[in-house]
Amino acid sequence: MSKYSNLLFSALLALLTTSCYHEVDLDDFKNNEGKNLLTLNSLICPDSVIAVSATRPYFFSDKHNERTYIKGLNILLSINGQECETLTYNESRHLYLSTIKPKQGDIVKVSTVFNDKLVEAYDTIPYRVSLLDLDVKRRGPLAIYTVRDFVFTYSITFDDPTNETNYYFLQWNEVDAQRDVMMGERDFTHELVFQALANDIHETLPGWKPYCAYGLPFSDRGINGQRHTLVLEETVQADRYSGGWRKPEMKRNFKLYAISKQYYQYLVSVLVNQTDDRGLQGGMIDLGIADPIKIYSNISGGIGIWAGYTISQKTINVFDSVGEIPRQ
């Protein structure tokens, strides 16, 4: 997301990300050369120091007890073209850590040498996009899965920045599993941006529907530069055999991640190539490329993902807006 007066950095970033961004088919790496590749993974945001995982690639078909972490690397961190520091390895976390936090709009680069080969990656941390409004309505009881289901329709409004292409990831969940109504089935299918995502994925995976229990990525195609309201639904089963709805609250936390183009393409590649939700769980990334599938990497000289993001979030108690789910 370009907001820089220094056009040289923007031009350099475009050149570098184009040159090092590539599709990886791990079938090609299942040999000695592949086993000697360095896998770098990191998600970078302004809310924390930079943490980098450095491992060897592994395959689920091979015998392995744990990941093979690579120690002793000199990983140099640069921000906006200025060398900042050499990351420090943390033994207990198996991560290389910085002492500084990057800022929104920073171009962040890491570089190291592994087996006499230069390995490096670049990305830009997007600017935060705020959630402006969050509204909810309830319908039901309806006969969908049981004779007593309730559909909650969420309307989430934000302003998409103008004059640039932007990428996002939307996620929502219960806040407290002990007190909140159990999370129902998410429905992304009525929303324009996820319909556009499905159309893109249909080129590779015909029939795919926009669903994932951990949320989904989307771009601003069709809404560029506009104030847009996302429309999402959640179906909660509330028949006498379902106990998850008998809770005192129904708090829901919504997170809108502004993500880089590299991160978006990585997440889409995971959706296309994995048959379950593993790749999008746990903070939107399954660290370490594993199964021999085609997946995208923006690590020059190695494989993995180096990607920036920011978060905006809002929490509501649904019952405050629409009342409690009626008792039978």
Regions found by a protein language model. Give the residues of each.
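Hydrophobic helical h-region of N-terminal Sec-dependent signal peptides
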Residues: 9-13
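A sequence/structural signal for flexible, mid-protein segments enriched
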Residues: 21-328
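Bacterial N-terminal signal peptides that target proteins for export
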Residues: 1-8
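C-terminal motif of bacterial Sec signal peptides marking the signal peptidase cleavage site
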Residues: 16-19
